[in-house]
């Protein structure tokens, strides 16, 4: 299918079908709105393009998924955060889950009937993910999971979790499971962050019983799964977030009375550089390339562009961030984490230096 024609048809459909969010801007309202948008797009087949037929999709280029995300997020119909979970976890299920499980579960995610979360980081294992300690112990046809995760986005609203556990020492001792969040022994505690939103959670697993058929891949495949998952965070997910940042740039220009051309130019240049890089990444993914450590470049560029944009907004909208309880304040505070979440910028630069430039460890 021609991407330009697809985008034009989608835009026409969105113009004719009102999916405008309501006045409630709480996190819970954002989650409900995301489900509403996904359901409408899935019922009209838009959400199914770019996904394999065996997982409930309609096939076609992967690029079509990026187009849908760009239009939905760029128009402000849904927030980029919940959308990113879909674009990260659905490919993971398709690649690692038993085919019958993927065929059953992926349509639930695409259609907005369910939201899933990603149980990776722990109190002592963030960027150093390989040190995770949540343990899974075999018990007949089940596995018993005990441990704690943290910074788990949207866990309080999630039906399932893609969970990394420790089954043996080292990288080869990490195993992934697909866990129902209503399983006895799971406790979710939302964390209030400085921007006032309970997006992140602590999740406790106290002798949680998970059937062996819910393992993703084989024992020890968890590290490979994580390495395959992270590039998806930096491909289609980033494309949506870029659309969101461009919409904020447009809003900044509309709201300011004194334009600082130099500051705006620098912010725009950072966004444009990011978009050009991400566009190349989209085309590589669409062409079947297996993304790797080079997506760390995309991650560094995104963090730089996001913080530059909201730093510019702070300078051009005096008091909007410091004195007013506005969305600019919330977004500025959230942007401070752009160099931390998904792997810190320091870690990304180390990856670029060691794995792309072969500069060694010193």
Name every feature range the model reports, one short phrase each.
Residues 1-82, 104, 108, 257-265, ...:
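Amphipathic, small/basic residue-rich leader segments at the start of a protein or domain
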Residues 43-107, 111-112, 154-160, 271, ...:
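Internal helix-loop-helix
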Residues 63, 67-68, 227-228, 232, ...:
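Glycine-rich phosphate/cofactor-binding loops in nucleotide/flavin-utilizing enzymes
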Residues 112-120:
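A short, Trp-centered hydrophobic/proline-enriched beta-strand micro-motif
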Residues 134-137:
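A structural signal for short hydrophobic beta-strand segments in well-ordered beta-sheet cores
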Residues 142, 146-188:
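A short core secondary-structure module
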Residues 186-275, 338:
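Glycine-rich beta->alpha junctions and the first turn(s) of the following alpha-helix
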Residues 254, 262-287, 301-304, 310-315:
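Loop-to-helix element that buttresses phosphate recognition and phosphoryl-transfer chemistry
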């Amino acid at each position: 299918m021609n991407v330009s024609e697809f985008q034009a048809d989608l835009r026409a459909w969105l113009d004719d079908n009102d999916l405008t969010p309501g006045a409630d801007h709480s996190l819970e309202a954002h989650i409900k709105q995301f489900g509403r948008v996904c359901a409408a797009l899935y019922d009209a087949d838009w959400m199914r393009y770019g996904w394999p037929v065996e997982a409930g999709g309609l096939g076609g280029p992967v690029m079509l998924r990026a187009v849908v995300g760009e239009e939905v997020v760029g128009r402000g119909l849904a927030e980029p955060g919940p959308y990113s979970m879909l674009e990260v976890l659905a490919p993971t299920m398709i690649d690692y889950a038993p085919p019958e499980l993927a065929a059953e579960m992926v349509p639930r995610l695409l259609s907005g009937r369910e939201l899933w979360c990603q149980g990776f980081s722990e109190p002592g294992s963030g960027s150093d993910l390989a040190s995770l300690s949540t343990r899974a112990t075999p018990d007949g046809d089940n596995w018993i999971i005990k441990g704690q995760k943290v910074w788990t986005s949207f866990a309080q609203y999630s039906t399932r979790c893609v969970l990394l556990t420790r089954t043996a020492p080292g990288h080869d001792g990490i195993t992934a499971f697909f866990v129902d969040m209503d399983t006895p022994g799971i406790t979710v505690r939302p964390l209030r962050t400085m921007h006032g939103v309970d997006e992140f959670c602590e999740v406790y697993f106290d002798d949680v019983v998970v059937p062996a058929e819910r393992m993703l891949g084989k024992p020890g495949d968890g590290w490979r799964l994580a390495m395959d998952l992270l590039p998806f965070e930096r491909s289609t997910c980033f494309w949506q977030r870029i659309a969101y940042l461009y919409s904020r740039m447009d809003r900044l220009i509309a709201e300011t009375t004194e334009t600082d051309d130099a500051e705006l130019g620098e912010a725009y240049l950072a966004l444009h550089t990011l978009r050009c890089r991400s566009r190349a990444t989209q085309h590589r993914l669409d062409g079947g390339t297996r993304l790797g450590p080079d997506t760390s470049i995309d991650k560094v560029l995104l963090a730089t562009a996001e913080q530059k944009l909201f730093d510019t907004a702070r300078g051009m909208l005096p008091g909007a961030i410091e004195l007013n309880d506005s969305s600019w304040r919330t977004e500025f505070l959230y942007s401070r984490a752009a160099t931390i979440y998904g792997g810190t910028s320091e870690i990304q630069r180390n990856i670029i230096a060691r794995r792309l430039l072969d500069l060694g460890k010193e």
